[in-house]
Structure formats: C-alpha cells, structure tokens
C-alpha cells in the first residue's frame, strides 16, 4: 500500500544513452536501438493520495534515413490496481501531442501533463487491465484511462 505517492506506477523504455556513443544505424554497434521491457505482472496495488497518473510507455522515433523505429513495452498485466487521487487543485495543461521523452532521465514528471487522470499508456504490445479502480480528483475532467498505440 502506498500513501501520498507521486506516481503509483511508472514503466518507461526510452533511448537514454548513458555511454555517450554516437547514434548510428550500424548493425551490432549501437545500444541506442536495444533494450526491452516485457512480461510484467503487477497486482494487488493500493495507493491513496496519489498525485500524477500512472505512465507506461515505450518509444517511437526514426533512423537517420527516416525509417520508423518502434520499441514497445510488451505483455503488461495490471490486476487488482486501486488508486485514489489526492483532492487538491488540478492545474493541467495537456499538449496536443505528448513528446516521446527519448533521451532524458526516465522519471514520471518528465512527461509533463498527459491526457489521462489515472493510467496513460503508449507504445504497448499486450496490455491487460483487470479489476482497475481509479478515483480521480473531483476537479479533473480528463479520461481516467488513455491508450495510445496500444496493440
């Protein structure tokens, strides 16, 4: 059980390159396109007085030649997930497009405001949500769950 937590759940696959290697498309040389987050089961979560939505995200970008690159978080199962948000004023400024946040340190507040009040998921292959109970702030009029590029 969590009390006064900022972000109840944060799963982020991005391209943070801590080795400072130059980005290249050369096979076998670049850690940039690597990495995976997959086969996750999270259950029996209780959070009260939460501040920001849970965020689950992979990434999408393009190679130097413009070829799209998509790295999804795969096979995530949330079960028995209960979150109640803190009743304080909500000052939300959701951009038309949420940036990918590819290079910075992966932390929930780096994404800024998103268009969900409870769970925001993007670039996910295989997301199962069971027994989800989210109570947003009374003043928050965003949808509780938003899925973008979730297959």
Where are these regions (language model features)?
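Extracellular/periplasmic carbohydrate-active domains that bind, remodel
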Residues: 1-151
């Amino acid at each position: 059980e969590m009390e006064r937590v900022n972000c109840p759940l944060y799963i982020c696959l991005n391209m943070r390159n801590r080795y400072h290697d130059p980005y290249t498309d050369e096979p076998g040389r670049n850690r940039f396109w690597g990495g995976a987050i997959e086969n996750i089961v999270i259950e029996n979560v209780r959070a009260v007085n939460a501040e920001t939505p849970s965020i689950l995200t992979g990434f999408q970008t393009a190679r130097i030649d413009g070829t799209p690159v998509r790295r999804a978080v795969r096979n995530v199962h949330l079960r028995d997930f209960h979150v109640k948000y803190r009743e304080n004023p909500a000052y939300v400024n959701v951009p038309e497009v949420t940036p990918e946040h590819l290079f910075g340190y992966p932390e929930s507040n780096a994404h800024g405001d998103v268009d969900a009040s409870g769970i925001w998921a993007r670039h996910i292959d295989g997301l199962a949500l069971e027994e989800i109970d989210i109570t947003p702030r009374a003043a928050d009029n965003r949808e509780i769950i938003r899925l973008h590029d979730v297959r």
